[in-house]
Amino acid sequence: MYTKNLNSLEINEDYQYSRPIIKKPFRHITLTVPSSDIASFNEIFYLEPQYVAQALRLTNTFQAAIDPLTLNFDFEKALQIANGLPNAGITGTLNQSVIQQTIEISVMISQIKEIIRNVLGLVINSTNFWNSVLAAITNTFTNLEPQVDENWIVWRNLSATHTSYYYKILFSIQNEDTGAFMAVLPIAFEITVDVQKQQLLFITIRDSARYEVKMKALTVVQLLDSYNAPIIDVFNVHNYGLYQSNHPNHHILQNLNLNKIKG
């Protein structure tokens, strides 16, 4: 069994629109499902229920990018996987150190949120999605005690003065901003902090410490599985708001070189 955080989009029931419409109140669902696979990512889905299977399939595909010896995220392997996905393309990548300083954790969280916004490579207007991103980043650096034994966190070098760990998140998003596509963003953090582990487990966003943070991430977009789409979408994906020429993601996805389906 493992847990998924699902942000469920509620759909316009009279189908006057073919794209997902978010209605208030917004529903955040934590779902625990049986699984024969070990999830190495903290998985956060923001999508319509009929696309959960596609998101799970993509998540499981990127499990192959986890090095079985170190349990770290193999960035080159992830690129190879992304380039082999059918009807998919890459909109952003990152593989570098992003923090090397003494910093208040709340400030670091805000900086990393903007880094994720950039590596996503798409304009996502949903406040709820970005609140989920902010919560996930916050849990990468704080609230660690309840997560201490989770598969997405790997404790490495521990000493009286330092702690190093890996933390892996995977976001899946599908809404009116992504149109006929789903975007998947696996992220791996390599974190070293000048704090002993037992203290780190209870660190808060108002605390400061010296951090070294490296991020490995890439964003893959894939065409939605047509058999899960409303009939109107199967025959006319241009009904999605994304295909309005003034939508900020229109040219990004329109000009994307999608991987071909191998025959």
Swiss-Prot record:
Lineage: superkingdom: Bacteria
Keywords: Sporulation, Toxin, Virulence
UniProt modification remark: Active after proteolytic processing.
Cellular-component GO terms for this entry: extracellular region
Keyword Disulfide bond: no
A single MF term (Gene Ontology): toxin activity
GO biological process: one example: sporulation resulting in formation of a cellular spore
Family label: Belongs to the cyt1/cyt2 endotoxin family.
Function per UniProt: Kills the larvae of dipteran insects by making pores in the epithelial cell membrane of the insect midgut.
Name recorded for this polypeptide: Type-2Bb cytolytic delta-endotoxin
Gene that this polypeptide is encoded by: cyt2Bb1
